[in-house]
């Protein structure tokens, strides 16, 4: 079996001790207040709150963390952002990842959305010392995280405002399964490179399941990819543009864009080349894939976005900046039509795994497509 599993945003971190513009390295020193809003490390206009959860099998103090965007307090809010939201937008991150995409929040707020993001248990803001990052044995465990988040959101926005759920990569799989189990709960589902199928051939996927089951019976916490690649050789889109590797910048106007300067990442929350991939967690993901294969019955409109091409691999190639290097984008598009009866597939030439981290023109194409689609299915 071959698994390409790095951070789902292809995230690499600055060296330990190097300050991130969002306060990344220091973000682990203080947790958000419990069941109350407090400042978030993303800066003015962003607040977070810790959501206490019931003890699970690990009994390690698992919590979730909800982040909200308040455009009125955000000096970077986009012109024309309305003061009264007309819908709720809840974002779920991917594997070895957390919410940091402030530009996504601002785009949604400009559309009239009340933007929230959820760092799931044992990820990002919710990770606590001694916990296995990202660990779960069933994706259904996140129902509690989502339930607690929605209770807090409804306390903010009321019960009449319609909900759009969004997910990136594994977060897209979690969101899809949740939407299937909760008919009538959503106005729409928006997916950014949702991980709906194990990358590689169908044979690899089929053989992988029984092997994983055997390993999981022996030791579900066993990590299967330790030392598999030198971290120094890993290509990460968040590193920014390196002229000695990437050559001349295609457009000088991009010089100050994070695509060139680098995205600000917390190294404790997005580990390079990857957090430990444990067989019990991977089995839980594959069980989710199997549910999608059987066909889901999501009742709301679904937008499934992905890159136009795939170049699986973790080391740099000229194609790495314009393709999905983490999952098979073609397989995702094929599987997406099995999510429900009304599914829109959008593919973006030049897009990377997290489409919102693509080069500036592609990013704008992604946001433009989202605006048009939401005008048709969400905005009133």
What are these regions (language model features)?
Residues 26-82:
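N-terminal cap/lid segment of alpha/beta-hydrolase-fold proteins
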Residues 70-119, 127-129:
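Short, surface-exposed "cap/lid" segments of acyl-processing enzymes
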Residues 95-96, 124-162, 362-366:
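Catalytic nucleophile-loop/oxyanion-hole region of alpha/beta-hydrolase
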Residues 170, 175-276:
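Alpha/beta-hydrolase-fold enzymes
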Residues 273-294:
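Active-site nucleophile elbow and catalytic-triad environment of alpha/beta-hydrolase enzymes
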Residues 298, 304-306:
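Short beta-strand/loop motif that positions the catalytic acidic residue
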Residues 311-347:
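Conserved loop-alpha-helix segment in the C-terminal half of the alpha/beta-hydrolase fold
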Residues 342-380:
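Catalytic active-site module of serine/aspartate enzymes centered on a nucleophile-bearing elbow/loop
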């Amino acid at each position: 079996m071959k698994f390409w599993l790095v951070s789902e945003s292809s995230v690499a971190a600055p060296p330990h001790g190097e300050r991130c513009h969002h306060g990344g390295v220091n973000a682990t020193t203080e947790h958000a207040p419990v069941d109350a809003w407090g400042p978030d490390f993303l800066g003015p206009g962003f607040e977070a709150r810790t959501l206490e959860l019931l003890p699970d099998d690990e009994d390690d103090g698992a919590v979730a963390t909800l982040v909200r965007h308040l455009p009125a307090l955000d000096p970077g809010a986009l012109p024309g952002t309305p003061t009264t939201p007309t819908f709720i937008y809840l974002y779920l991150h991917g594997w070895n990842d957390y919410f940091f995409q402030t530009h996504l929040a601002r785009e949604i707020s400009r559309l009239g959305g009340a933007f929230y993001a959820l760092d799931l248990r044992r990820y990002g803001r919710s990770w606590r010392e001694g916990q296995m990052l990202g660990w779960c044995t069933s994706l259904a465990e996140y129902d509690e995280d989502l339930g607690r988040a929605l209770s807090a959101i409804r306390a903010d926005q009321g019960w009449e405002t319609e909900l759009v759920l969004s997910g990136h990569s594994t977060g897209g799989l979690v969101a899809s399964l949740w939407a299937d189990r909760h008919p009538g709960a959503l106005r729409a589902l928006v997916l950014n490179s949702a991980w709906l199928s194990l990358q590689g051939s169908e044979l690899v996927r089929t053989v992988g399941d029984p092997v994983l089951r055997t390993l999981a019976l022996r030791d579900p916490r066993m990590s299967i990819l330790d030392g598999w690649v030198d971290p120094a050789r890993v290509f990460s889109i968040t590193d920014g543009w390196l002229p000695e590797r990437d050559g001349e910048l295609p457009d000088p106007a991009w010089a100050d864009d994070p695509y060139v300067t680098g995205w600000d990442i917390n190294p404790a929350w997005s580990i390079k080349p990857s957090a430990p991939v444990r067989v019990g967690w991977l089995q839980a993901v594959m069980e989710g894939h199997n549910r999608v294969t059987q066909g889901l019955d999501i009742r709301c409109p679904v937008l499934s976005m992905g890159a136009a091409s795939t170049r699986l691999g973790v080391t740099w190639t000229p194609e790495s900046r314009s393709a999905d290097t983490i999952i098979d984008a073609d397989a995702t598009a094929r599987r997406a039509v099995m999510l429900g009866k009304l599914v829109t597939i959008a593919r973006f030439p030049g897009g990377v795994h997290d489409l919102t981290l693509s080069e500036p023109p592609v990013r704008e194409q992604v946001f433009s497509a989202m605006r048009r689609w939401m005008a048709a299915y969400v905005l009133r």
